[in-house]
């Protein structure tokens, strides 16, 4: 991996982590329960990666640092599945197994649905825009 790519990932990761910290600070947190702000961050981040990847695959020559910066860096730093599992572990330890399992399911299923729906919606919008350009 080249130094410019590493720098792009590092800069993007810092921005993504700061955005996550800001969003998590703005969401209510309750002790001994799963952190639903983490679910929000992961689902939103996965939706954005769906938009990004669909957009980049349709560009003829995207800048070589765009995907490392935005995808791996910003969105990789924004999402946090390790924190989601830690939150679920904390909920289990607090004798809240239902909350823990619901949070795990919300993170995993929500993320899969978000990336799929966002990529599909982006593809539809880009196809419509391309059709309008032709007419």
From Swiss-Prot:
It comes from Thermobifida fusca (strain YX). Fluoride-specific ion channel. Important for reducing fluoride concentration in the cell, thus reducing its toxicity. Na(+) is not transported, but it plays an essential structural role and its presence is essential for fluoride channel function. The keyword Transport applies. GO terms for molecular function: fluoride channel activity; metal ion binding. It is found in: Cell membrane. Pfam families: CRCB. It is a multi-pass membrane protein. It catalyses: fluoride(in) = fluoride(out). This is Fluoride-specific ion channel FluC 2. It comes from the Bacteria. One of its GO terms (cellular component) is plasma membrane. Belongs to the fluoride channel Fluc/FEX (TC 1.A.43) family. GO terms for biological process: cellular detoxification of fluoride. The chain crosses the membrane at residues 5-25, 36-56, 68-88, 100-120. Its main location: membrane. Signal peptide: none annotated. Na(+) binds at residues 76, 79. Keywords: Cell membrane, Ion channel, Ion transport, Membrane, Metal-binding, Sodium, Transmembrane, Transmembrane helix, Transport.
């Amino acid at each position: 991996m080249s130094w410019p790519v590493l720098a792009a990932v590092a800069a993007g990761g810092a921005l993504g982590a700061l955005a996550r910290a800001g969003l998590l600070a703005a969401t209510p947190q309750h002790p001994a329960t799963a952190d639903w702000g983490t679910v929000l961050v992961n689902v939103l981040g996965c939706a954005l990666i769906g938009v990004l990847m669909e957009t980049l695959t349709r560009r003829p020559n995207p800048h070589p640092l765009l995907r490392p910066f935005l995808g791996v860096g910003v969105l990789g730093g924004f999402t946090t599945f390790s924190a989601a599992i830690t939150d679920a572990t904390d909920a289990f330890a607090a004798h809240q197994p239902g909350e823990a399992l619901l949070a795990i399911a919300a993170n995993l299923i929500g993320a899969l649905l978000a990336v799929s729906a966002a990529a599909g919606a982006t593809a539809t919008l880009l196809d419509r825009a391309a059709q309008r350009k032709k007419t």
